[in-house]
């Protein structure tokens, strides 16, 4: 804040867009909206609706509480009703020269000024502007949290331990689903295997066989899976996502007639890119350098992947990404990445082995080893499997947070065969 001369930050949250707010408070306002206002001296104020008033005393950071019942659900009591503009005036925000608004999205457009785009509800932005003098500058400040130097892009040992729980859980679910696949199962049965321990998902659960998006549907249905179909499965929790796509067959000769070369045309080139990603990422490397390595290994012009080949993971599945063309952001200790390469070859089923890893220097690795020995044992076991069984020369800076990093079975009825490096 001080470096960029912000006098105050206003951080917005709702159920779908609460991670920046939750980073400071430890909770989201669920079915209500909420605001966290932090001034340059560290004083914090929570503005909450009816059903979150009780949460203020549990906040990670100490904060004054203001009840704003308009954040509550429709037709609930409007006791203590206040005008939001008046609340902002009472907080004397009009005395500030520069205020940052933080929703969840950091805009990276080239054709508009990103700092002038706001993803908060209009009634909040309008109330704020009506409370300020014309001299006060208001900008989007999400980059302070999730931008190239954002504080949420670097995790300490405790944060890694918490996020490993979600990544581990996702990979356990995906492996369990892969192992239990059998012809005649319903998509909903598979979807049930992709949930566990009552945890909230960070993405929509995918368990889709055959034709995707029938009737514009994203969700698992009662459709029974059939031999020879393609199937996609995805699950994610705070800390990581696991995803797999392949065929419901046992061996290569059972591939569809028009995709007999599926392994050579799609799967093996993709797997080589995953291997290159895991073997080359390292501390100090520029994001643009890893991007170029992936582009050389799996040429974008031929395989038509159009998103980033990886991105930051935290509470949200995609927070932001430093892995873009010409990115000058250095890979740093404490970063968590989703390996996310999505090839699209006309006429062929896709392939996916998305997983989550952390990057850690020796100091952070030593801290994890001492403070979280069980976590470190899991990481060591995963590294040993990747190096010794899959024959991937895993970068020493990479800590696999999930159990299935580098593990790809394209023929999902064959439970005992996976790709490995020759």
Which residues does each predicted region cover?
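Active-site neighborhoods and metal-handling regions in enzymes and metal-associated proteins
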Residues: 1-422
């Amino acid at each position: 804040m001080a470096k960029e001369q912000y006098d105050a930050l206003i951080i917005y949250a709702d159920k779908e867009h609460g991670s920046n707010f939750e980073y400071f408070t430890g909770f989201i306002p669920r079915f209500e909206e909420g605001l966290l206002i932090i001034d340059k001296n560290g004083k914090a104020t929570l503005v909450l609706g009816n059903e979150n008033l009780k949460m203020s005393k549990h906040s990670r950071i100490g904060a004054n509480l203001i009840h704003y019942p308009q954040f509550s659900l429709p037709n609930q009591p409007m006791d203590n009703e206040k005008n939001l503009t008046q609340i902002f005036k009472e907080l004397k925000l009009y005395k500030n020269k520069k205020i940052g608004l933080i929703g969840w999205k950091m805009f990276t457009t080239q054709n508009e000024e990103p700092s002038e785009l706001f993803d908060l509800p209009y009634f909040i932005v309008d109330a704020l502007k009506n409370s300020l003098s014309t001299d006060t500058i208001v900008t989007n400040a999400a980059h302070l949290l999730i931008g190239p130097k954002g504080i949420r892009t670097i995790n300490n040992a405790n944060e890694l331990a918490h996020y490993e729980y979600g990544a581990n859980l996702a990979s356990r679910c995906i492996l369990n689903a892969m192992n239990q696949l059998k012809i005649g199962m319903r998509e909903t049965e598979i979807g049930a295997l992709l949930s566990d321990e009552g945890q909230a998902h960070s993405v929509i659960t995918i368990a889709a066989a055959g034709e995707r998006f029938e009737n514009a549907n994203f969700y698992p249905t009662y459709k029974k899976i059939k031999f020879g179909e393609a199937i996609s499965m995805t699950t994610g929790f705070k800390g990581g996502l696991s995803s797999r796509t392949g065929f419901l067959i046992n061996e290569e000769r059972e591939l569809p007639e028009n995709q007999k070369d599926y392994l050579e045309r799609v799967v093996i080139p993709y797997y080589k890119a995953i291997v290159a990603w895991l073997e080359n990422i390292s501390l100090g490397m520029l994001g643009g350098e890893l991007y170029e390595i992936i582009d050389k290994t799996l040429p974008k012009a031929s395989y038509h992947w159009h998103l980033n080949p990886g991105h930051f993971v935290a509470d949200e599945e995609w927070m932001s990404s430093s892995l873009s063309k010409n990115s000058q952001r250095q890979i740093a200790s404490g970063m968590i990445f989703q390996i996310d390469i999505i090839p699209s070859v006309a006429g062929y089923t896709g392939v996916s082995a998305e997983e989550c890893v952390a990057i850690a220097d020796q100091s952070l690795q030593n801290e994890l080893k001492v403070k979280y020995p069980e976590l470190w044992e899991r990481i060591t076991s995963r590294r040993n499997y990747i190096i010794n069984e899959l024959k991937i020369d895993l970068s020493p800076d990479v800590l696999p947070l999930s159990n299935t990093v580098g593990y790809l079975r394209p023929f999902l009825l064959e439970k005992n065969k996976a790709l490995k490096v020759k």
